[in-house]
Design a protein with these regions (language model features):
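Auxiliary Fe-S-binding modules of radical SAM enzymes
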Residues: 1-38, 104, 235-370
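Conserved, mostly hydrophobic/aromatic
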Residues: 14, 44, 74, 114, ...
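Conserved short loop/turn motifs at secondary-structure junctions
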Residues: 28-31, 62-64, 116-120, 222-225, ...
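Glycine-rich, proline-tolerant flexible connector loops at the mouths of alpha/beta enzymes
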Residues: 32, 62, 84-85, 113-124, ...
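N-terminal pre-triad scaffold of radical SAM enzymes
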Residues: 39-83, 88-115
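Mobile, glycine- and charge-enriched loop segments
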Residues: 48, 56, 60, 77-80, ...
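Hydrophobic faces of well-ordered beta-strands that scaffold small-molecule active sites
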Residues: 56-62, 110-112, 142-146, 176-178, ...
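Conserved Radical SAM active-site core
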Residues: 81-219, 223-240
Length: 370
């Protein structure tokens, strides 16, 4: 087991400026190799408390999966359907706006997360109409469209991704989710998503968004065909861009769910990676991102509420969102994907922390009363 106490002491002593001379790839590899999850978790939790104390945030959220039509055919995805498949769907603009308005009325959502497949039949006018329709009807932040979806729109329009981003921002786009990153190493992408945008394209589109004043989250999907070197490389690429653009406001590591996917059918991945890998990834992420990205989500959607509670004790500060209508993870049969505000607040309090409702930019809205 690699002794990582010198790395942890550097971080605890604030012995560097992470935007200029922070932890390195070699440091990240040593942390990834270490089996001392408890010690790394203790340090990660202390770093989280330095930033946010005993508060844990969440957001009232609706997920809108607007289409499952996709021509990328990722081997890790159980959600997509090819064009003209009998189970393929695209939600109309009117229906999508109706769902958002209803969720605002019933649950007082602060954000709608809009994601779907790479549908070649949808031009930018669909998204502009959707965003403007939502903004006209209710005060809800639009957190929408991963870089790979942005790239798909640009290809349909024969336009640049920067122009697509600018038009979507004008239509009401507030921030971008970090989906489509998976592992930012093309060797891995060639195995799990050969038709999806390359790693450098994902990073470029994120940088373009940041330069246009559109903040985003970043993600890592681990526990499939990658190794720890790939994980470290992927995390370092996010760190490198953050030092440059300062546009990532949250990081979300989540484990691959193999059920009903091509990776499982081909025997490449049989099981999910388990709870200890989650806690290690959370702890390493907090340590590596300290001073760079303040917010790390506990990713209850793929790991369950109990593991999300443990993640809060290993460096996460955000429980993610209430979810109504999520269909991507649901397609794997992993678990129930509805979680209410009361359930989240209860889960946070059970580990002795204070629940705080936030907006899509991680600004605190209110401390939840006892």
């Amino acid at each position: 087991m690699d002794d990582v106490r010198d790395i942890l002491e550097r971080v605890m002593n604030d012995d560097f400026n992470n935007y200029e001379d922070g932890l390195t790839y070699d440091d990240c590899m040593r942390l990834m190799r270490s089996n001392d999850v408890h010690l790394m978790g203790v340090v990660a939790y202390e770093l989280k408390k330095r930033i946010l104390g005993d508060r844990v945030t969440f957001i009232n959220n609706l997920i809108l999966n607007y289409t499952n039509v996709c021509i990328t055919y990722c081997k890790f995805c159980a959600f997509y359907r090819p064009p003209r498949h009998e189970e393929a769907y695209t939600v109309s603009i009117d229906e999508a706006v109706r769902r958002v308005v209803r969720a605002k009325s019933l649950y007082n959502i602060r954000q709608v997360l809009i994601q779907g497949g790479h549908n070649p039949e949808l031009g930018i006018e669909y998204y502009e109409g959707l965003f403007k329709g939502i903004k006209d009807k209710c005060d809800v932040a639009i957190h929408a469209l991963s870089p790979s979806e942005i790239d798909m729109i640009a290809r349909v329009e024969r336009s640049s991704t920067r122009e697509v981003l600018a038009r979507l921002k004008d239509a009401g786009l507030d921030s971008i989710p970090g989906g489509g990153a998976e592992i930012l190493v093309d060797e891995v992408k060639d195995m799990i998503s050969p038709l999806k945008i390359r790693s450098e394209q994902w990073l470029r589109i994120m940088e373009e968004a940041h330069m246009l004043g559109i903040p985003s989250s970043a993600t890592m999907m681990y526990g499939h065909v990658e190794n720890i070197e790939h994980r470290a490389l992927s995390l370092m690429k996010i760190i490198e861009l953050q030092r440059k653009s300062k546009g990532f406001i949250a990081f979300i590591p989540w484990n691959f769910e193999p059920n009903n996917t091509e990776l499982q059918a081909e025997g490449m991945v049989k099981y999910s990676s388990g709870g200890m890998q989650l806690l290690k990834m959370i702890s390493v992420s907090r340590i590596m991102l300290y001073g760079l990205i303040d917010h790390i989500q506990s990713s209850w959607l793929t790991n369950g509420v109990a593991m999300a509670q443990l993640a809060l004790l290993h460096g996460t500060d955000d429980f993610g969102g209430t979810l109504y209508g999520e269909e991507v993870v649901t397609a794997t049969g992993a678990r129930s994907t509805t979680l209410t505000q009361d359930m989240i607040v209860k889960a946070i309090r059970e580990v002795g922390m204070v629940a705080v409702e936030r907006d899509n930019l991680y600004n605190n809205i209110r401390v939840m009363a006892e």
